[in-house]
Amino acid sequence: INSVMDRLDGIENVDMVIGGPPCQGFSVAGKMDVNDKRSQLIWSYVKVISKVKPKAFIMENVKALGLLEKWKPIREKLLSELRHLGYTVNFMILNASDYDVPQARERIFVVGIKGNCNNVPNWEEMIKHYSHKAPTVREALQVLDKAGHGNNPSTCRAKITLASNPILRKSPYAGMLFNGLGRPTRIDGYSATLPASMGGNKTPIIDEKELYENCAPWIVTYHDEIMKDPSKAAFKEAPSFLRRMTVEEAAILQTFPIEYEFCGSQSSKYTQIGNAVPCNMAKAVATRVINVLNGEENVIFKPTEHNLFDFSYAES
């Protein structure tokens, strides 16, 4: 990224910069190493802001950066530097399930508006206007065919085996009941956060009988059984109706359009999906920033042909 910084010099009249600097160095799912090179990229983001001086910016990152005491000095320095550049900065933690995303995924958003914006309402309250009750996993996946067929063509063949020494929690959807990091998916609720590490035995698990035949979730029965008698846990293959979540299913749970195409290997596709900000969540935040820039509640924003997304929304 340092090699392209000079190309930003002289760019003017930028409306908005949107980005999510790589977060593995801050994530509880990663090594949480402040010296991780990827952790330094938040400062590259600040440098981009200082060079192009947009009217507004949106930065997304993992919840840990916003909450953990370990990252407090980083957090305070980040906000201080952005404010020093002349921005009114708001910092918030949002849950994707509040924004029409069938996933319990919490992330921080740092939103900055150039100049003094004391008259701007509370951001979280503003964004709640775009809040919609999310569909369940079952409801969201109804748009797809069965795994391996039609518009859901991919499959993940990583074997699913039960752990002989499971890590038990009160919920069957927490802990570690299987070998590997893939956890069972709550079909009639929200998915857990889809990680960038998906692929192989780190891919979430789907109960096909529950999803397609409305059977009771097998994992609940099994969890109850070994909670009562842990000796019943054994290393063995899981029932055949348990399988890994497909690329297409993961994309739907991140609210990508069904026709959206990902490039690269299957492993790369899982990573792209897990790293992404859920589309509906991004829309809610970006739309509100556009409102502020336009000074109006109705939004009509037509990006150029080079933009990936076309926002055209109006509040009812």
Which residues fall in each region the model found?
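SAM cofactor-binding core of SAM-dependent methyltransferases
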Residues: I1
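Class I S-adenosyl-L-methionine
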Residues: V4-V14, F26-T193, G199
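Non-cysteine beta-strand/loop elements that form the S-adenosyl-L-methionine
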Residues: I18-G19
